[in-house]
Each structure stands twice: as structure tokens, then as C-alpha cells.
Curated annotation (Swiss-Prot):
CDD domains: Cis_IPPS. Its cofactor is Mg(2+). This is Tritrans,polycis-undecaprenyl-diphosphate synthase (geranylgeranyl-diphosphate specific). Pfam families: Prenyltransf (PF01255). The active site is at residues 35, 83. Keywords: Magnesium, Metal-binding, Transferase. Substrate binds at residues 36-39, 48, 52, 80-82, 84, 86, 208, 214-216. GO terms for biological process: dolichyl diphosphate biosynthetic process; polyprenol biosynthetic process. GO terms for molecular function: ditrans,polycis-polyprenyl diphosphate synthase [(2E,6E)-farnesyl diphosphate specific] activity; magnesium ion binding. It comes from Methanosarcina acetivorans (strain ATCC 35395 / DSM 2834 / JCM 12185 / C2A). Gene3D superfamilies: Decaprenyl diphosphate synthase-like (3.40.1180.10). Its EC number is 2.5.1.89. NCBIfam families: uppS.
Length: 298
């Protein structure tokens, strides 16, 4: 009886929370650091492969939740460059699991009904041939899809991503294809993973599970440039619930509201400084001058 009551309360709370976040702005791009699979397994006396398998099940659910809520782009940190330091058995097991999930997505009619474009970001030269084959297969099959974008980071490191982009640009400058005057933020973005000219957009919200409060070298260019919101939560990845996702979006929305209030406050200060009588009717135009901090107005 107690469990049933809790379940009913949980469902009602989830519905209320979803209704609340749907009444405000939904982040276009969410990036997730899926941490805690191994600790989840360890607490239960199970193998690490069990933890990764349970985490993979949650990943499938999160993809569905994001699509249903209206998120346009989801980037998942599946395997970092540092993960190669793990045992050969664990690395091989992870690659086999990732390959299995790619093939499942390839054969799932929902991938095509929902027009999901799937791309991999990372150093593919470090991946086994069978995995690269599956990646190429699903990328080719979904390359024209535009409704929902799913990026999977494998053999990925943020610094490494920026370094390879700089090398590509330097080679283009050296060969005469580009001049130094052509190099700007937009050009660098276009040379980041997954491929030249096909960039991952700025991130609105980073979610990390497992209790650690750090972003682990994940999408530094796309995240820091947009000053994205971050949400750190205690549950291990296999324990991640829809409520946790909804709460993370609520944090993003609260941050957006705080920025709007700050901007309104700054506009009012400028109006008062310039004279309400003369400029009061121009508050809307003044608001378009923000961020005022960059213009020297505190």
C-alpha cells in the first residue's frame, strides 16, 4: 500500500513538473555526461558490464523524453579519450554495447518516424573497424533527417577537438585555401567534430549525473561560449529518472528568468541615468542594447 501511494504521488509530481516546464522555454540543445554506471554496479555487487548495460537502457529512455518534451538536439558523452585507460575487457565491452545500440537505432522504425539524425563526434581512428562500420551505416541512413539531432561523443575530448580544428585550419592557411583574415569563431566552430562544415551548435544545458560537479572537458567551445546552464545531480546514470531531466530543465528556465530580470534592472538604471522624462518611452530600444556590461554600464 505504501509503495502504491508513493508511486501515485511520484506520477502526479512528474506530470505537474512537466506541465510547469512546458509552459516556458525549452532548451534547444542538452548535453549529458552519463556518469556513475560503475559505481552503481559496485554498490550492488555486480560487474561493471552490468552497470553499463543498465545505463544504456536509461539512455534509450532519455532520448525519448527529450524528443517528447521538444528538445531539438541531444549530445551524449558515451566514451571519453581518458576511458581508454580502463581495462581492455571493459573497453571492448563498451564498444560492443555501443555498437549494439547503434544497430538497434538503425533498425528501429521510430528513428525514421521521428526523423532523428544521428552523428558521432570524436576521434574515429581510435575506434574498432566494426564500430566505425555501424557508425557510417546509421549516419548515412539518417543524414537527411532534421527533426531531432542525436550526437554521440565517442573517443572524445574537448581539448583534443579544439586542437584538431586548429590543425585543420592551419593546414588550410598553409596551402593557401584560407587566409589568416578568414579565421574567426565561426570558422573554428565549423572545423570541430563531427566533420569540417558540420558543427555541433552551442549547448544550452549540461547535465551530469553521479554527484561530481565538473564538466570533464566536454564540449568546452560550445558550452563556455554560450555560458550554458549546468545541472549536477546525485543519482548514478542507471538511476536517472524523467523527474531529474525535468528538474534540470527547470534550472535552465530559472537561469533564463534571472538573466531577463538582470537585463530589466540594467535598462532601468540606464533610463534613470539618462532621464526618465526624455528616454522613458525608449526602454524597449534600450533593452536591445544589452548586454550592457560589455558597453561599460555596471
Amino acid at each position: 500500500m505504501k509503495n502504491r501511494t508513493f508511486s501515485m504521488f511520484y506520477q502526479e509530481y512528474e506530470q505537474l513538473l512537466e506541465k510547469e516546464i512546458l509552459s516556458s522555454e525549452i532548451p534547444d540543445h542538452i548535453a549529458v555526461i552519463m556518469d556513475g554506471n560503475r559505481r552503481y554496479a559496485g554498490q550492488r555487487g555486480r560487474t561493471r558490464s552490468f552497470g553499463h548495460a543498465m545505463g544504456a537502457e536509461v539512455t534509450e529512455q532519455v532520448i525519448e523524453w527529450c524528443y517528447e518534451i521538444g528538445v531539438k538536439e541531444l549530445t551524449l558523452y558515451a566514451f571519453s579519450t581518458e576511458n581508454f585507460q580502463r581495462s581492455e575487457e571493459e573497453v571492448d565491452g563498451l564498444f560492443n554495447l555501443i555498437n549494439e545500440k547503434f544497430l538497434k537505432l538503425y533498425n528501429d522504425k521510430r528513428t525514421y518516424e521521428k526523423e532523428t539524425q544521428i552523428r558521432v563526434i570524436g576521434d574515429r581512428t581510435k575506434l574498432p573497424a566494426f564500430l566505425n562500420k555501424s557508425i557510417e551505416k546509421i549516419e548515412k541512413a539518417t543524414e537527411t533527417h532534421r527533426k531531432f539531432n542525436l550526437n554521440v561523443a565517442i573517443a572524445y575530448g574537448g581539448r583534443q577537438d579544439i586542437m584538431q580544428a586548429v590543425r585543420d585550419i592551419a593546414a588550410c592557411v598553409s596551402s593557401g585555401k584560407l587566409s589568416l583574415e578568414d579565421v574567426d569563431e565561426n570558422l573554428i566552430s565549423k572545423h570541430l567534430y563531427p566533420a569540417p562544415g558540420v558543427s555541433v551548435p552551442n549547448v544550452d544545458l549540461i547535465v551530469r549525473t553521479g554527484g561530481d560537479e565538473r564538466v570533464s572537458n566536454f564540449l568546452p567551445w560550445q558550452a563556455n561560449g554560450s555560458e550554458c546552464a549546468t545541472y549536477f545531480c546525485a543519482p548514478f546514470w542507471p538511476e536517472f529518472r524523467k523527474i531529474d531531466l525535468l528538474r534540470s530543465i527547470r534550472v535552465y528556465q530559472a537561469r533564463k528568468d534571472e538573466k531577463k530580470q538582470e537585463n530589466s534592472y540594467r535598462v532601468s538604471k540606464v533610463i534613470n541615468f539618462l532621464g526618465v522624462g526624455k528616454y522613458g518611452e525608449k526602454s524597449e530600444e534600450l533593452g536591445q542594447l544589452l548586454p550592457l556590461k560589455k558597453q561599460g554600464v555596471a
